[in-house]
Amino acid sequence: MRHRKAGRKFGRRTNPRKNLFRNLAVSLILHERMTTTLAKAKTIQPIVERLVTLAREDTDHHRRLAWAQLGDQRAVAKLFDVIAPRFVGQPGGYTRIYRIGQRRGDGAPLALIEFVA
């Protein structure tokens, strides 16, 4: 039985799942909004929120931690130079999720995730 097993697996093993989360986080940071399934949006939201909280204090150590999580220098630069300064005085809640209907092919619930402000 799978009782009390937290987390979504998305039909992937560990490394492909981590790569999925990394790619979704990089896409959200670079484009500042994206459309994906509701489950993926809910999963990526706390990851991105933690990265923004980390980036609010711009130090070499925090940049290296963000680089280890994202693996994309453009995303790290945009996170620290563009996105994080907007949220310096805000204690959290940097992203929001809107439900936008269902996907035509399989009926999966879709969502728009974007940065606030």
UniProtKB/Swiss-Prot annotation:
Record flagged with keyword Acetylation: no
Molecular function, one GO term: structural constituent of ribosome
Disulfide bridges in this chain: none
Gene Ontology BP terms: translation
Keyword entries, A-Z: Ribonucleoprotein, Ribosomal protein
Tagged with keyword Ribonucleoprotein: yes
Source organism superkingdom: Bacteria
GO CC entries: cytosolic large ribosomal subunit
Pfam families with a match to the protein in the record: Ribosomal_L17 (PF01196)
Description of how the protein assembles with itself and partners: Part of the 50S ribosomal subunit. Contacts protein L32.
Family: Belongs to the bacterial ribosomal protein bL17 family.
Database matches in HAMAP family: Ribosomal_bL17
NCBIfam families: L17
Name of the protein in its database record: Large ribosomal subunit protein bL17
Species name: Thermomicrobium roseum (strain ATCC 27502 / DSM 5159 / P-2)
Lineage: Bacteria, Pseudomonadati, Thermomicrobiota, Thermomicrobia, Thermomicrobiales
